[in-house]
Amino acid sequence: MTVTIEIAVDIPCPAWTEAMPDAEARCGRLAAIALGAVDLPDGVVELSIVLADDATVQGLNRDWRGKDQPTNVLSFASLDDEDAPVVPGAPLLLGDVILAFETCAAEAHDQGKTLADHFSHLVVHGVLHLLGYDHMDDEEAAEMEALETTLLAALGIDDPYGEQ
């Protein structure tokens, strides 16, 4: 058997495609690259990526994390380490990654990066969260950042943490 990756991309905020006409295709490529960094079980693996605006992300951040402010990317993992598909052969539902346009665009500008490069980093970052990576302590952060940097370097994108 093999792994089939299904990525649903929803773009309710048209500013994304105005700024990056290839945003939808880019999401698919980036998610596949991040998913390729881990051993996935045979079968179908599904996730969604939503390219939203700040207001949408602020509402989600407030409702789910208790933080009433927008953020660049949110990840909502569907599974924890003990979860498995309920029905044998059912798709493995990883979860959702949601990005906020205004925050991402402002960060890219402030950091002297292209929106495409910053977007690439945040999609990879969000998908890695769905796979169980986190940055709650220094050790976890170092592992996650090293993997992000490696994956992005393969795309010709500079280390997003290099100037921090």
Swiss-Prot record:
Family matches, as NCBIfam families: rRNA maturation RNase YbeY (TIGR00043)
Binding site for Zn(2+): H125, H129, H135
Subcellular location: Cytoplasm
UniProt keyword rRNA processing, yes or no: yes
Function recorded in the entry: Single strand-specific metallo-endoribonuclease involved in late-stage 70S ribosome quality control and in maturation of the 3' terminus of the 16S rRNA.
Cofactor names: Zn(2+)
PANTHER family named among the record's database cross-references: ENDORIBONUCLEASE YBEY, CHLOROPLASTIC
Main location: cytoplasm
Keywords: Cytoplasm, Endonuclease, Hydrolase, Metal-binding, Nuclease, Ribosome biogenesis, rRNA processing, Zinc
Molecular function, one GO term: zinc ion binding
HAMAP family per record: Endoribonucl_YbeY
Family named by the database record: Belongs to the endoribonuclease YbeY family.
Enzyme class, first EC level, given as a word: hydrolase
Top-rank taxon, per record: Bacteria
Pfam annotation, one family: YbeY
Database matches in SUPFAM superfamilies: Metalloproteases ('zincins'), catalytic domain
Source organism (scientific name): Paramagnetospirillum magneticum (strain ATCC 700264 / AMB-1)
Protein name per its UniProtKB record: Endoribonuclease YbeY
Cofactor binding summary note: Binds 1 zinc ion.
Cellular component per GO, a single term: cytoplasm
GO biological process, one term: rRNA processing
Enzyme Commission designation: 3.1.-.-
